[in-house]
């Protein structure tokens, strides 16, 4: 079943001085419970596409649908997670996680239980009453992930959520996200500049062309799950997809990315 449909979407940013075409005729379908990563050069419109899916922007032309319904505004069944955790410093961990419950006026008792379960799932049991300044960057992002999941959305949109972290923490959280996705089974769209992150996490990788962004290539990652990192986790399939992705992103002629083609 299709969770997200992007139909002929183009988007232009307009100012008094200029018009910037960010996206051009995007066509994309993402299946229910599928994990999709978006990769491409800086400025190709990855984050813009994510914001269109979230209902934070309206496309200039075209249509975005989630669950068969047009996205015209932010929806409660869609969560968006950013590069920075944006935790409220005066709130405790559990209070930060519960914020969407308050905003959406959901049942506090039932969702308090879910919040505690998510904190346990992400290794934060015992930190419920700590404040953000008492946590490491990786722990803060775990709290942000719990907050994004607490109201049980069907779709999770993630805009480079681990990019500001050190390499070791980033790898740890990538593996943890894969495990959580395996348990929660959400539809996830994940923006990244990391080839390793894209191949490790994705069922499919959407490679976007330079601006104006188009879907230049769709790569299917056929490696078994759960996936691991390191020498002992060598996977010919991940190596193959990573090499193809590297070739696409670092091609001498960027115009190669401008012509969409099917999976190889």
Q: Which residues does each predicted region cover?
A:
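A short, flexible loop at the N-terminus of ABC-type nucleotide-binding domains that lies
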Residues: 1-3, 12-25
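Conserved ABC ATPase "signature" region
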Residues: 98, 102, 109-127, 179
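Short coil-to-helix segment of the ABC ATPase nucleotide-binding domain corresponding to the Q-loop/switch region
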Residues: 91-98
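Conserved signature/switch motifs of ABC ATPase nucleotide-binding domains
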Residues: 130-133, 151
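Helix-to-loop junction immediately C-terminal to a conserved catalytic motif
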Residues: 54
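Catalytic Walker B motif of ABC-type/P-loop ATPase nucleotide-binding domains
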Residues: 156-159
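The feature captures the beta-strand-to-loop junction immediately N-terminal to the Walker
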Residues: 39-41
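Conserved ABC transporter NBD signature motif
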Residues: 62-74, 114
């Amino acid at each position: 079943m299709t969770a997200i449909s992007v139909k002929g979407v183009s988007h232009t940013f307009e100012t008094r001085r200029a018009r910037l075409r960010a996206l051009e005729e995007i066509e994309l379908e993402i299946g229910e419970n599928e994990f999709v990563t978006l990769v491409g050069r800086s400025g190709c419109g990855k984050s813009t596409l994510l914001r269109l899916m979230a209902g934070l922007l309206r496309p200039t032309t075209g249509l975005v649908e989630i669950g068969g319904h047009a996205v015209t505004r932010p929806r409660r069944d869609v969560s968006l997670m950013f590069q920075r955790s944006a935790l409220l410093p005066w709130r405790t961990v559990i209070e930060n996680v519960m914020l969407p419950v308050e905003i959406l006026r959901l049942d506090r008792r039932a969702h308090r239980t879910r919040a505690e379960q998510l904190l346990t799932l992400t290794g934060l049991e015992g930190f419920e009453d700590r404040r953000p300044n008492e946590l490491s960057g990786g722990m803060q992002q775990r709290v942000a992930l719990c907050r994004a999941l607490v109201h049980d959305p069907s779709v999770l949109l993630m805009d480079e959520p681990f990019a500001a972290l050190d390499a070791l923490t980033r790898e740890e959280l990538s593996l943890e996200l894969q495990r959580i996705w395996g348990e929660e089974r959400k539809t996830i769209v994940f923006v990244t500049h990391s080839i390793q992150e894209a191949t490790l996490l994705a069922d499919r990788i959407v490679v976007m062309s330079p601006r104006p962004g188009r879907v230049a290539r769709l790569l299917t990652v056929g490696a078994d799950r759960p996936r691991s990192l390191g020498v002992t986790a060598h996977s010919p399939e991940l190596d193959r997809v990573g090499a193809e992705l590297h070739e696409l992103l670092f091609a001498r002629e960027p115009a190669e990315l401008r012509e969409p083609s099917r999976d190889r």
